[in-house]
Amino acid sequence: MAVVKVNVTVDLEDDQKLKSDSLDILKLIRPGWTASDINWRVFTDGITNKLVGAWSGSDKTDTVLIRVYGFGTEKIIDRNMEMENMIKYRKLGSGSQLYATFNNGICYEFLHGDLLSQATCLLSDVYRCVARGMARLHSVPIDTCRPVMWDRLRQFIGVCSPDCRPRLQTEWWTRAELQEEASHLQKML
């Protein structure tokens, strides 16, 4: 299934508007769904995005997630790389199907499963399964041999305004000091 590009900007401030804007996307990727049969769940645990799940009727097996990017998150998250990785991991059998992109977010498959706890992570069949999954993830070929850590670190430092939080500058470091420290670390490592 090709990723659909939708020219819609989803409102993330108002949950009702979030749902009605999301419906415009669902009409394209789930044309067989009837608007009155769609159930919604707005997830509240995100810190950078707004996430809503949608499914038709009582059948949650085909749940679609609509993730609306928070304001300014593109400063710290490479959204194009995120989508490339989703597609790559899906092809390798790990990860959600990406259904659509829209002006300020993505729409993708919800993968059903069980949440792990500290207790379940100690079960041998569970931690072995997690280890296999992590090994598979870390064996994915990458497009470059150049590490991105230093670029990302500088990007994060750059997001901080030079005069951000005076308390941080007196108790910790200024942005210039952080940049100098990052350069020193890169030389040492």
Residue map of PLM features:
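Residues that form generic nucleotide/phosphate-binding pockets
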Residues: 25-29, 156-163, 181-188
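ATP-binding pocket architecture of kinase catalytic cores
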Residues: 41-180
